[in-house]
């Protein structure tokens, strides 16, 4: 899929949601490297398992934390920690990511994140 095809795919699918499709498309492009680094077929935002009860994939990733003692829970586990400038640490760790059955399922889940208390203040700007 070309960059243009990926952007059109996301834009067309997100046009049905109550949010500006340009915002959703831009975020998907950044998070997935134009769809080249998506998780499974449809996780274009790199959304981790969290409280998800659906299918998951265990994928090695890099995380940045402010402590050298960050803990993960099995099956996630720290493979390596590297100290970075500024008191931060780079972790290499297999993480559980949500494995969606469709792009629409991913988009609806992504939108639901903005409705949670932590991001609720951003929801009012979804058409800007």
Regions found by a protein language model. Give the residues of each.
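Catalytic cores of secreted/periplasmic lytic hydrolases that degrade extracellular macromolecules
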Residues: 1-128
């Amino acid at each position: 899929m070309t960059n243009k095809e990926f952007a059109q795919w996301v834009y067309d699918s997100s046009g049905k949601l109550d949010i500006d499709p340009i915002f959703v498309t831009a975020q998907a492009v950044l998070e997935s490297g134009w769809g080249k680094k998506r998780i499974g077929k449809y996780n274009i935002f790199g959304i981790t398992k969290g409280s998800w009860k659906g299918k998951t994939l265990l994928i090695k990733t890099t995380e940045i934390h402010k402590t050298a003692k960050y803990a993960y829970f099995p099956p996630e586990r720290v493979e390596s920690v590297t100290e970075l400038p500024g008191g931060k640490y780079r972790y290499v760790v297999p993480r559980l990511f949500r494995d969606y059955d469709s792009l629409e399922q991913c988009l609806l889940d992504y939108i639901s994140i903005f409705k949670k208390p932590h991001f609720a203040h951003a929801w009012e700007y979804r058409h800007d």
